[in-house]
Regions:
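Basic nucleic-acid-binding interfaces
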Residues: 2-172
Length: 172
C-alpha cells in the first residue's frame, strides 16, 4: 500500500477573499495488475538459465523504481508479472520501464545470441485483492500450464475472460 505524507494546510486567495483549506494528502492505492508481454515475433529466445537471471534482475529493478512486484515469470517467449501499480506511474510508464530495462539488461549481459527485443504491446489485466494469491499461483505454475497449451492458446483464453477481442498478430 502506498501512503503519502501527512496532512498539509494550504492558503489560497480567491477573488480577494482569503480561504484556508485543509487537504488530506493521504493517498491510498491498491491496484493489482497481471502484466503479460512477449518477445518479438514470439520467438523463443531465452533458455532457462537466461530466463532465471532476467527474472531476478526484473524484480530488483522493479524494487529500485518503487514498483511492488509480487512475482514474475520469464518463459522463452513471454513474461508474466503481478504488480501493485504505484500512484506515481501509469500502466504505460511501468511497461516502458519493465520492458525497456529488461531488454537492455538481457542484451548487455549477452544472455542470448544476437539482439533481444520484446514485441510491441502488452496485456495489463486488473486483479481483485481476493484473487491475488490465485494469480500469483497461476504465474508460479506457468511451466505446468504450457505443457497443456501454447502461449497463444493461453493468451486467447485469458483475453476473452476480460471481454476483449483477441487479435493473433504473429509478426509484430
Amino acid at each position: 500500500m502506498h501512503k503519502a505524507p501527512s496532512r498539509t494546510t494550504i492558503t489560497v486567495r480567491i477573488q480577494r477573499r482569503r480561504k484556508e483549506l485543509t487537504l488530506s494528502t493521504h493517498s491510498y492505492s491498491r491496484c493489482w495488475l497481471h502484466l503479460v508481454w512477449e518477445t518479438l515475433r514470439r520467438e523463443p529466445m531465452l533458455d532457462k538459465r537466461a530466463a532465471a537471471r532476467a527474472s531476478v534482475k526484473l524484480a530488483e529493478y522493479s524494487q529500485e523504481k518503487g514498483i511492488y512486484m509480487k512475482i514474475n515469470y520469464f518463459n522463452a517467449e513471454h513474461t508474466h508479472a503481478l504488480i501493485d501499480l504505484p500512484t506515481n506511474l501509469t500502466i504505460e510508464q511501468v511497461m516502458q520501464l519493465l520492458k525497456g530495462s529488461s531488454s537492455h539488461w538481457i542484451n548487455q549481459s549477452h544472455l542470448v545470441k544476437g539482439r533481444f527485443a520484446w514485441g510491441k504491446g502488452y496485456g495489463a489485466f486488473s486483479v481483485s485483492q481476493s484473487d491475488v494469491s490465485k494469480v500469483a499461483n497461476y504465474i508460479a505454475t506457468q511451466e505446468e500450464h504450457h505443457r497443456k497449451r501454447s502461449f497463444a492458446q493461453e493468451y486467447e483464453i485469458f483475453v476473452s475472460r476480460y471481454g476483449l477481442e483477441w487479435r493473433n498478430e504473429e509478426n509484430r
